[in-house]
Amino acid sequence: MGKFVDLGVSVFDAEFTLNPYDYLKEIYDRKEVLGFHSDGMNFMFRFEQSRAVIFSKNCTRAMGNNEELQQLEEGYAKRYPNRAWHFRNSYTHGEPDLKFKAAIGRFVAQVADQASFFGAEPIFAKLSQGGTLDNYIDEISTLPMRVFLETCKLPYDNHDLEVLHTSGCAFLKSLENFYDEELIAGCDSGLACIRDYMESQFYNLDAESPLRPLISAGYNCGMNDEQLIANIGGMFLTSISNTVGISSAFILRSLLRDQAAWRTLQEQPELVENEDVIMELLRRDNHVKALSRQFDQSMEIDGFKINSGEVVCLYFPGINMDHNHWKKPTTIDFSRTFTGENNIIFGGSFYTCIGRKLTMAFLSNMIDGFLRHLPATAEIVDEEIEVDGSWMAERMITRMPIHLG
């Protein structure tokens, strides 16, 4: 495969996870380089080259479709029945029923319209209390899940909230880490917890829950209870904390590092409802890390030949900071738009795991809460930030002290 240079740092390194541009900026312009190599994997990180791979019908999202992996998966299916049950029943791992997909769109829109962050005000108000918040991430990581459950009229206590959040993280942490059986086991345990919670609620839903029309639509499509439980749990309870919670942590970090952007949003608060503004904050930093693509046919990219059967990882923090595509990539620029070719910062067309409308509605409320309470003296110190760098598909901040002044 073409030339992949060693950066001298692991892709799992905390500093590389937080500040990848510092390592990549010198090789964006090197024409003889296709990507970088780390931890036994090859990564593409330029915008145009990665976009060509994303939109190629011959590049499937997979760690490698070969006999070894098939045998490994067969063993996992026997040893980890909850994971196998989820994959068997969730349409996100197969062809979706288009009518049910449309019903999901209606459900997402309803939740986005009905969601209330009024009860979250005490969490946002902590930004006004002065002193130092040692780990505000703990406060905001489960907040989106809390709002989602309340909007769906699903009862929960603090234990449920923590279990659902950590279970979703366990599922996500196993993605792209197919050879790490410890993570597969964690995924299985997490999916068991999510399944148990959904089964305990599925037959006792509040009459006004927006889940009721979704379930009815599923029945009309011929889906059974197991498929509906797997799809609801798999799409939303495994993803909402990272898509909104973890990305909110990165957005907060970006705002605290870019005083001009922070002031602009405080002076023009209506901007937090603008999708392009939210997408620009996500372009600057979000939770997506690397997703693999297998080449089902040979492909040539800028003179580099990638052979059939080979696998590369698309490194999204690099794609989103490519200075040959994004002017002044380290700067937050609210004049950028994300239609047309600019729409791949998550992997394709405003795509997010929980749906574009729901993501935008939740993030708009999160950003608004930050801006209403952050004092002008607030700051962070990068050296104090801690990350869980062992994730392959995700970037995860685990601790970020905020000095409020």
Which stretches of residues belong to each language-model region?
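Cytochrome P450
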Residues: 1-405
